[in-house]
Amino acid sequence: MAIEIKVPDIGADEVEITEILVKVGDKVEAEQSLITVEGDKASMEVPSPQAGIVKEIKVSVGDKTQTGALIMIFDSADGAADAAPAQAEEKKEAAPAAAPAAAAAKDVNVPDIGSDEVEVTEILVKVGDKVEAEQSLITVEGDKASMEVPAPFAGTVKEIKVNVGDKVSTGSLIMVFEVAGEAGAAAPAAKQEAAPAAAPAPAAGVKEVNVPDIGGDEVEVTEVMVKVGDKVAAEQSLITVEGDKASMEVPAPFAGVVKELKVNVGDKVKTGSLIMIFEVEGAAPAAAPAKQEAAAPAPAAKAEAPAAAPAAKAEGKSEFAENDAYVHATPLIRRLAREFGVNLAKVKGTGRKGRILREDVQAYVKEAIKRAEAAPAATGGGIPGMLPWPKVDFSKFGEIEEVELGRIQKISGANLSRNWVMIPHVTHFDKTDITELEAFRKQQNEEAAKRKLDVKITPVVFIMKAVAAALEQMPRFNSSLSEDGQRLTLKKYINIGVAVDTPNGLVVPVFKDVNKKGIIELSRELMTISKKARDGKLTAGEMQGGCFTISSIGGLGTTHFAPIVNAPEVAILGVSKSAMEPVWNGKEFVPRLMLPISLSFDHRVIDGADGARFITIINNTLSDIRRLVM
């Protein structure tokens, strides 16, 4: 019998299929992953709702899909069904020997993540899901890092005790699992028979844990993530270290119990430094049963794997060629790559099926830093005459305090540095007469208040409309330059970003189709989005797709400033504080409200004459807003 397999409830948005994990003819178990999909904010694997044989695959990599879409057709495998009664009979006969296991509820708590509270940013499972040990359950984010919280044991999700946006800390209850109880009578019997043969306890040995290859520089220990007595799994993070340009977690090279900690927060370490001593189990006793002997090579192979991994990574360090295939990485790794400004297409993945791991991104960043430092000395490249950043001990001159930069400041700082260095900026300054505009705006606000429209019209919406009109007349300003500097992408839509000052730093929400919206509609949208920005609730989609940016700091003062172009855009408008000034009208000086504006643009795309024409269009439109209806 044919069974249709459809996408379960994944929300309203369409997602892209990035990987198909089965092929026609495969026998599939219930809950086995079928496809991987990725949206704007996360990627996930879609599991099979039941067992069967893949008869048809209705989708391909790159297709868009959504909740309820048909992805595959399964054959229920009648042959297997015929054999089922016989198997059932055998199971029934065997049943008295082992009573069914009783299910028990177990709490799942946040492991030791330090003393600070963190925010739940994503819940990766739902009630009813069968979860394996070490499978990721939630994603949490603090001031300095984000991480996925794994399941400490296998089970079925019975209750979820947290929501996205909740604050949690070490020990917080996040879920309740239903887990299988003790096995029946047969299991103890088997254990008792095996016990005499393997009575001698395995001998414990002591092994040193050293810092792996992190480059030649010393780094500072910023966090110790385990304590004496902790049982640690291989690859579990032990400490966090931070250098001048990056931070990383140092993983355990093997499993064991922490016997001694050799470092403290604030200590300096480097490649090869001793950080801990582990107590590890020795070889299994010689009298172990034959079954155990047959399985013994597996741990040995697993122990060898970490040793082979650095070699693979070392080979990959020089292989940063562009990867045209789809990049396989979890949302956590993608976020890490965004924070470091890493193009994942250039990173070679060493995980299963080429998946990019945290270590791959860290290796790429480390190699990129080494190349950047070596390039000026080796080739005379870099910025001519650029000196290294001065190292000054400020504490010699008086009392100091060091304050960590916010997450937004760190990200935007790197972007601004790149934009300023890579884009040849030219800035035109002008003043526009907004006397009539301001009179009209105040009149409209009074009318809106009388009619209880619950809207406040600001000068920014008129500037947005004036910019949209200029972009329609001069489409070269509504473009982006290709990475190789050889082509322009001309956009047929007009989306304008407006910089908003928030307690956490500057953010730039994007307003879509400004040329198609009226003043009232834009005013309402500006009020709503600005509030979301200040509350820190903007989504990624609300900050993407911009064509041109407006940075208005007139409310804070200043007469002129030169804004930095927001790549990959090619121009930005700065708006300063308006003031009454005497203006000559041909007969006499009259008081007029003048607004200083400044247009910065990429000189590779726009020449000075076009820059002057563009700012003049804005000037003329704001001076006589009747032009907006022409």
From Swiss-Prot:
The terms under GO molecular function for this entry are: acetyltransferase activity; dihydrolipoyllysine-residue acetyltransferase activity; lipoic acid binding
Q: Using the UniProt annotation, give all residue ranges assigned to the region (Hydrophobic).
A: 373-389, 542-567
Task: List every position bearing N6-lipoyllysine.
Answer: 41, 144, 245
Q: Give the top-level enzyme category.
A: transferase
Keyword Acyltransferase included in the entry's annotation: yes
Which SUPFAM superfamilies does the entry mention?
CoA-dependent acyltransferases (SSF52777), Peripheral subunit-binding domain of 2-oxo acid dehydrogenase complex (SSF47005), Single hybrid motif (SSF51230)
Q: Could you tell me what reaction this enzyme catalyses?
A: N(6)-[(R)-dihydrolipoyl]-L-lysyl-[protein] + acetyl-CoA = N(6)-[(R)-S(8)-acetyldihydrolipoyl]-L-lysyl-[protein] + CoA
Instruction: Name the domain of life this protein comes from.
Output: Bacteria
Family listed? Belongs to the 2-oxoacid dehydrogenase family.
Q: What is this protein called?
A: Dihydrolipoyllysine-residue acetyltransferase component of pyruvate dehydrogenase complex
For this protein's source organism, the top of the classification is: Bacteria, Pseudomonadati, Pseudomonadota, Gammaproteobacteria, Enterobacterales
Gene responsible for this protein? aceF
